[in-house]
Curated annotation (Swiss-Prot):
It comes from Alkaliphilus metalliredigens (strain QYMF). Belongs to the UPF0251 family. Coiled coil: none annotated. It comes from the Bacteria. It holds the Pfam family DUF134. This is UPF0251 protein Amet_1463.
Length: 116
């Protein structure tokens, strides 16, 4: 019997889910798939300035899981930057924190704090 899925908590979806080179033949480029929880780990650690422990707490996962998710995301970003590939963000095992969730539970990201 497989283990039940543990949903990762994500504050908000990216405003755009496709990133890559702006060349005329960009559609011919290889696409790297990044999950929403990988995007969230990068957002929390690199943009919000959290450490892995704080990121893990926000995402409702173990620190080792947050570290693995973050490292996977960094490898994908580096591959896309160095090799001119496209990153597409979609899928994963996540649940969005809702706007109705109390702020003490969500903590609120910059987007929610700024009302965007």
């Amino acid at each position: 019997m497989p283990r039940p899925k543990k949903w990762r908590k994500v504050c908000c979806l990216p405003e755009s889910n496709l990133f890559g080179p702006l060349t005329p033949h960009y559609r011919d480029r290889e696409i790297i798939m990044m999950t929403v929880e990988e995007y969230e780990a990068v957002r929390l650690i690199d943009l919000e300035g959290m450490n892995q422990e704080e990121c893990a707490e926000k995402m409702n996962v173990a620190r080792t899981t947050a570290q693995r998710i973050y490292n996977d995301a960094k490898k994908k970003i580096a591959d896309a930057l160095v090799n001119g590939k496209i990153i597409k963000i979609e899928g994963g095992d996540y649940k969005l924190c809702s706007d109705s969730e109390p702020m003490y539970e969500c903590g609120g990201c910059r987007r929610h704090s700024c009302g965007t």
